[in-house]
Design a protein with these regions (language model features):
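Cleavable N-terminal export/targeting peptides
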Residues: 1-48
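Outer-membrane beta-barrel transmembrane domain signature
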Residues: 26-33, 37, 94, 155-164, ...
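Hydrophobic, lipid-facing positions within transmembrane beta-strands of outer-membrane proteins
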Residues: 51-53, 71-75, 79-82, 132-136, ...
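Membrane-embedded beta-strand positions of outer-membrane beta-barrel proteins
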Residues: 53-55, 77, 88, 103-107, ...
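Transmembrane beta-strands of outer-membrane beta-barrel pores
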Residues: 57-63, 81-83, 107-113, 142-144, ...
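Extracytoplasmic loops and strand-loop junctions of Gram-negative outer membrane beta-barrel proteins
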Residues: 57-59, 118-121, 148-150, 202-208, ...
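Solvent-exposed loop/turn segments connecting transmembrane beta-strands
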Residues: 62-69, 87, 95-97, 128-130, ...
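Repeated loop/turn-to-beta-strand initiation elements of outer-membrane beta-barrel proteins
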Residues: 83-86, 101, 144-147, 175-178, ...
Length: 269
C-alpha cells in the first residue's frame, strides 16, 4: 500500500508541476517524457533513486483551422526510483523486466481539449475537456534500437483509446547524443469524434456536421541532447506529425502535417 500511496503522491506532484501554469503545453511535454524515459530505461534495474528539475519550451502547430501555434513554457519534474517513474505528465509503476523487455502500468495527463473561442472555427462549439489516461507500456531494448508499445484508455470525457508504437536509436559523439525517432499512433473513433467531430447542435454555415472515425497519425523527428556537466543537460527536439484522414476530414482542421520544436534544460540530482 505504501508503494501505491507514493505513486499517487508523485503523480499529483508531477501533474501539478507540469500543467498548472500553461495548460496548452502538453505537446511540449510529449517529447520531454520520451527523452526522460529513454534515460530511465538505461538504469531500469538500478535501485538508486534520482530526481531532476528543469524548464521546457515548445512550439507545436495546431491542426485546427486558424488556431496557429500552441506555445508553452513550463517546469519539468523527473523522478526515477525502484518502483515508480515520473517524467512530466507521465507516471509509471514498474512491473518488472524480463531479459531486454520492460513493462509498466501508466497514468498520463493530456490537454488535447479546447474551449469555444480558442479559434474562429471553434466558435459555438461545446468545450472539449482535457484527458486523464490509464494503461500500460512495454519497451524492448534491442541491440540496434529501442522499441516501445503503449496502450492508453481515457478515464472519462472522450472514452477514447490510443495505441502507440515507437522506435528510436541514439548515437553519441562526445557530449552530444543524436536520437532519430519515429512513432505511429492509432486513435479509436471515440477519441477522434470527441476532439474533431461536429455535433448536429454545433453545425454552422461554415461548419458541417462530422462524425469522427478511427485514424492513425505518424511522426518523425530528431532529438539532440547536450551534456553540460554530469548533472546538467540541454535538449532540442525537432519533429513533424502527419495526421490521419479521420482527423483531416474534419471541417475543424485545415492541415495534414504540423511541425514541432521543443527545447529544454534539465538538472539531475
Amino acid at each position: 500500500m505504501r508503494h501505491y500511496q507514493s505513486f499517487f503522491n508523485i503523480l499529483v506532484l508531477g501533474v501539478a508541476a507540469s500543467c498548472a501554469s500553461f495548460a496548452q503545453a502538453q505537446d511540449v511535454i510529449g517529447n520531454i517524457d520520451a527523452n526522460a524515459n529513454a534515460d530511465s530505461q538505461a538504469d531500469a534495474k538500478a535501485d538508486v533513486t534520482t530526481w531532476g528539475l528543469g524548464l521546457g519550451v515548445g512550439v507545436q502547430r495546431s491542426p485546427y483551422r486558424d488556431y496557429g501555434n500552441k506555445t508553452g513554457v513550463l517546469p519539468i519534474l523527473l523522478y526515477n526510483g525502484k518502483y515508480f517513474r515520473v517524467a512530466g505528465t507521465t507516471a509509471d509503476f514498474k512491473l518488472g523486466s524480463v531479459s531486454q523487455f520492460d513493462f509498466t502500468l501508466r497514468a498520463k495527463y493530456s490537454n488535447d481539449g479546447y474551449k469555444s473561442g480558442d479559434a474562429t472555427i471553434l466558435n459555438g462549439m461545446d468545450e472539449r475537456k482535457d484527458g486523464f489516461w490509464l494503461g500500460g507500456s512495454a519497451a524492448w531494448r534491442a541491440p540496434f534500437a529501442k522499441f516501445t508499445l503503449e496502450w492508453l484508455k481515457a478515464a472519462g470525457n472522450s472514452d477514447g483509446q490510443t495505441v502507440k508504437l515507437g522506435a528510436e536509436r541514439g548515437f553519441t559523439v562526445g557530449r552530444v547524443k543524436l536520437t532519430p525517432h519515429l512513432g505511429v499512433t492509432w486513435m479509436n473513433n471515440d477519441y477522434v469524434n470527441y476532439y474533431y467531430g461536429v455535433k448536429s447542435t454545433e453545425v454552422r454555415s461554415t461548419r458541417a456536421a462530422y462524425t469522427g472515425k478511427s485514424t492513425t497519425n505518424a511522426s518523425v523527428g530528431l532529438r539532440t541532447d547536450y551534456s553540460l556537466t554530469a548533472a546538467q543537460s540541454m535538449f532540442l527536439d525537432l519533429s513533424v506529425t502527419h495526421y490521419g484522414s479521420g482527423i483531416t476530414d474534419s471541417p475543424l482542421v485545415d492541415r495534414s502535417t504540423a511541425p514541432g520544436l521543443r527545447l529544454g534544460y534539465i538538472y539531475k540530482f
